[in-house]
Amino acid sequence: MAATQKSLCAIPADPIEFPADANTLDYARSEDAKCPIRHMREHFIFPTRASLKKKALDGRLPAYPPNHAKPGETATAQNGTSNTNDDNVTPAVYFCGNSLGLQPKATRDHINAQLETWASIGVHGHFTSWDNSPLKSWQDMAADCAAQSASVVGASPDEIAIMNTLTANLHFMMASFYRPTEKRHKIISEWKPFPSDTYAIASQIQWHGFDTATSLVELHPDENYYISTEKILATIDEHAESTALLLLPGIQYWSGQLFDMPLITAHARAKGIVVGWDLAHAVGNVPLSLHDWDVDFAIWCTYKYLNAGPGAIAGAFVHERHGKVDSDGFKLRLSGWYGNNKATRFNMAKDFDPTPGAQGWVVSNPSGIDLASLGAALSVYNLTTPADLRKKSLWLTAYAEHLLNGILKDEAASSAGDGKKPAFRIITPSNKNERGAQLSVLLREGLLDVVGEKMEAAGVVCDRRKPDVMRVAPVPMYNSYEDVWRCVDALRKAVMS
């Protein structure tokens, strides 16, 4: 398993320091040459500067120049690299993996295998697994993806369910784990969850006959958009007797702050509070140990750092203590036929025979196309380890921070005394243990769209969150030091012009 592979990357010192020549492209390239997992980049298809401007399908993949090669043929340009100025083969600088990851090259093979199976044997694909196919039989694909996800989230396969999408899974988990009473009815969350979480939490509180004004406790940040662990623990203590559920993001999507999940979980559970984590921005980004941390439940999407494709099927974790199916240990849930034990599922019995573990929460037959795409993504992810990805991520993110701070120093030197605010500030914690692969850059008011458009024109893709935040995410699976240098260079030119 990937989790047992020897770690290759060195853990950076604290604080992370860079030499005087670190602001040069030559330095970035020299670091790429030394990176022990640089080969992972070759497993992905990068948009090119030309393909980003496409207006219609043309039957060609990025990095295949017109009149030269189509998918399945041989192209001279190696994807993700280019030594020319030809936009057709020059890869974009893609720093948007925290919103949507790049397409793995394996995805097309896995989906084509699914389509061929369906076309060739129809319904028999539910129970047929071919030796030369990358796929299991359809009824076993979700369990296979769960097994491949085990090292990603730090859980046993039986504690993982691959199903639905993130917000749907949040509702299914809350149906079981948010059981408010007159005494314990509050949910502790944070001030700015991803809006879908906000809507789900509010609707669950209202569904149970309570009011968000009295049943929702929001953790607010300081003036630097930082929520300290001490504040979280103090809030738990303050509301312990009236709180039914603590529901926080592993990484705050807007600021990029990574929370101390094991400490917060232990503190809340010691107070009798159920603990759930939204891992949308943490899964595939930072190492996780959900079982060992004693988390009650967690949910995540798979289209960001796991690269399973837009709107891809999601995942849920349920700790093994909640997965018992005997009459005394059974956890109430909203049930459906695909949560029924596989051995008896097709008996079509009237009584529900739940699958032990998290897969007993599955309701419907999951999409085979979705599972093929996720299986492809996980097959690539597991070529390395969460530990090695994290170590490279620490270096890449620190390098991006170093170069961004260089812009601020140069700007301050050139505009001393003009009274202008700096063009931006980084609101993600500078402590490497309190962030993942994302740096959130809060731009001066009115700059976001102007800067974003200039960067896009330069072939750089970053995520913009109105009104003023640009999220810069060097993904260690496929981004390089040179990518970091080019991204920050484009940002420098945009804000200094």
Swiss-Prot record:
Q: Where is the composition biased (Polar residues)?
A: 75-86
Gene3D superfamilies assigned: Aspartate Aminotransferase, domain 1, Type I PLP-dependent aspartate aminotransferase-like (Major domain)
One short Pfam family name for this protein? Answer: Aminotran_5
Q: Which GO terms describe its molecular function?
A: kynureninase activity; pyridoxal phosphate binding
Q: What keywords were assigned to this record? A: Cytoplasm, Hydrolase, Pyridine nucleotide biosynthesis, Pyridoxal phosphate
Name the principal localization, coarsely classed: cytoplasm
The signal sequence is none
Q: Which cofactor does it need?
A: pyridoxal 5'-phosphate
Q: What is its EC number?
A: 3.7.1.3
**According to the UniProt record, where is the region Disordered?**
59-86
Q: Origin, by domain of life? A: Eukaryota
Q: Describe, as the record does, how this protein assembles with itself and its partners.
A: Homodimer.
This chain's protein is named Kynureninase
The species this protein was found in: Pyricularia oryzae (strain 70-15 / ATCC MYA-4617 / FGSC 8958) (Rice blast fungus)
